[in-house]
Design a protein with these regions (language model features):
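Acidic/His- and Gly-rich active-site-bordering loop/insert found
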Residues: 2-101, 110-126
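Histidine/acidic-residue-rich, glycine-tolerant segments that coordinate divalent metal ions
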Residues: 60-61, 82, 89-100, 107, ...
């Protein structure tokens, strides 16, 4: 199955890059990301996932039900931009003065949507459920806590494990750095 997933990921690469660039051009700040959420919803359309939209934020959770009982895995991606101007000259540079995706959240969002595509094609091989959490307000707004306090995950199953990622310019393309437990900065306390 590993080779199938790798092949599928390669086939989704152009779609992932296109979504990332679309989000990059129209960055939104904080908890109110209507255009970003619309792009994500469009990207999830046609997939066999249950979509639960946050009412307190523009976040959402898409739930993929596996074919057999098993663990519930949450994959999380942040969606918000930063209040700074972009001066990169890129053809897909920010069109919003004073806002840009300088931290990679546009990539995180596109990769998470593509992961939903890829895994939904293999739902018959999955034991348990996969929850895809698209979170606004990571940059100082406490978006994850707001979504959790709202009960957005109660529509699915309590996650047995949570995974997130962050692009890192210090690593070469195609290289993944990982470790067990918390890493990088956090606005909340991690209990475990």
């Amino acid at each position: 199955m590993y080779e199938q997933l790798l092949t599928g990921a390669r086939e989704l690469q152009a779609q992932t890059v296109a979504m990332r660039r679309e989000i990059h051009q129209e960055p939104e700040l904080g908890l109110d990301l209507p255009q970003t959420r619309a792009t994500v919803l469009d990207g999830l359309s046609g997939l066999d996932v249950e979509v639960h939209q946050s009412q307190a934020t523009t976040g959402l959770v898409a739930i993929l039900r596996g074919a057999r009982p098993g663990p519930n895995i949450l994959l999380r991606g942040d969606m918000d931009a930063l209040p700074m101007s972009e001066d990169t000259g890129l053809p897909y540079a920010s069109q919003a003065p004073g806002r840009m995706h300088a931290c990679g959240h546009d990539a995180h969002t596109a990769m998470l949507a593509s992961a939903a595509h890829l895994l939904s094609e293999h739902a018959q091989d999955i034991s348990g459920n996969v929850l895809f959490m698209f979170q606004p307000g990571e940059e100082g707004y406490g978006g994850a806590k707001i979504m959790l306090d709202e009960g957005v995950l109660e529509a699915g199953e309590k996650p047995d494990a949570v995974f997130a990622l962050h692009v890192h310019p210090g690593l070469p393309s195609g290289v993944i750095g990982c470790r067990s437990g918390p890493i990088l900065a956090a606005a909340d306390t991690v209990h475990g």
